[in-house]
Amino acid sequence: LYRLTRLYCTKERGLTNILWCYSPNGDAGPENYMSRYPGDEFVDILGIDTYAGLRDNNVEASRAFFWEAVKSQLTYLTVLSNDHHKLMCFSETGLEGLGDPHWWTETLEPVIRDYSISYVLTWRNAHDQPGHFYAAWEGFEHADDMKAFSELDSIVFLDE
């Protein structure tokens, strides 16, 4: 399906302005990550999807669990992206409801800083589901942490 979609978009529709990311769920592990890989000629970027969780309202334990998983995933993804000459990204992440007041600066940033990630993408903010959001907005109680994250020298947004 991945190959058919890419071929349809590029050959049939003539689209040339799309980057194609292969990104199985983060729990695929190094032994299964490439099991459905469509081939180097169909992929531009290798990514992982891994979400944080707040376990029993224990920010420190939740942070440690997230770091362990993400470091393992980004380590094997670094090897794979080098072997296949691909960019790598953190294609989906976030903490639903942002219950950690410092999720951006003390959970996400420390775990990505040592890896050559081309981009990080959080999941959506649902307009119709209270509590189902992954990015702060102006007026949100922890918006200052996302703002501090955005001002780090290592972080660049699309409009910069």
Spans of model-derived segments:
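Aromatic-lined carbohydrate-recognition surfaces of secreted/lumenal glycan-active proteins
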Residues: 2-32, 85-98, 122
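Intrinsically disordered, low-complexity coil segments
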Residues: 56-65, 82-83, 130-132, 140
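Alpha-helical scaffolding within the catalytic cores
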Residues: 26-41, 64-80, 102-110
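Substrate-binding cleft of secreted/luminal carbohydrate-active enzymes
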Residues: 86-160
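Aromatic- and acid-rich polysaccharide-binding/catalytic face
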Residues: 33-67, 123-125
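Structured segments of extracytoplasmic/periplasmic soluble domains
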Residues: 4-12, 76-83, 110-123
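Glycine-enriched alpha-helix->loop->beta-strand junction motifs that scaffold or abut catalytic
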Residues: 41-45, 85, 116
